[in-house]
Amino acid sequence: HGNRKKIIKKIENAGIDIKCWGRGWPAGRINSDEMVRIFCQAKINLGLTNSSGTAFLKPFIRIFFQKNYDGKVRAQDPKRWLDNFKSFLSRKRKQLKGRNFEVPGCRGFLLTDSTDELKNYYEDGKEIIIFKDVKDLISKTKYYLEHEKEREQIAQAGYNRTIKEHTYEKRFEEIFKVIGLI
């Protein structure tokens, strides 16, 4: 996951105890029940959805090169470069992830990086906390570890917003309205 390990190392170097799960982490993968338990019990759930250091580089390289079926890299046909470049420019690197809804939906406190869309769903500072960079992430982590009552109020507000507006039932209702089924 790109530079996530570097970010985690900086957090550890700042004296913050942190544990990570998933592919490539010492704690390994966990099942969905365990994930929900962690979301509920963790003091801070960290969202690094946009931290991939290769989010720009790999797609850019693919404009000019591609892997063959045997894994060997070869140059793309120059006639395809313009279309590949247009595709590259049109893609969004920052995406709203399910995790942005799952954590608040479990009454978990979410400290996350931002996407253009995220502020349309949650109020920063009231329902979730958004960090700008690693320095801001570390500062906000230390702050909210020390301010339990405020952290719990934000987690509860995030939960209330999620249950009110961001359930699958609400999403399907919106979709059905758009396509004219209701």
Where are these regions (language model features)?
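A short acidic/histidine/glycine-rich donor-binding loop in glycosyltransferase catalytic cores
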Residues: 125-131
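Short, flexible helix/strand-to-coil boundary loops that buttress conserved ligand/catalytic motifs
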Residues: 122, 141, 155
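Nucleotide-sugar donor-binding catalytic core of glycosyltransferases
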Residues: 1-124
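Hydrophobic "lid"/C-terminal helical patch
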Residues: 141, 175, 179
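C-terminal "capping" alpha-helix adjacent to the active site of nucleotide-linked donor transferases
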Residues: 134-150
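A charged, aromatic-enriched C-terminal amphipathic alpha-helix characteristic of glycosyltransferases
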Residues: 146-176
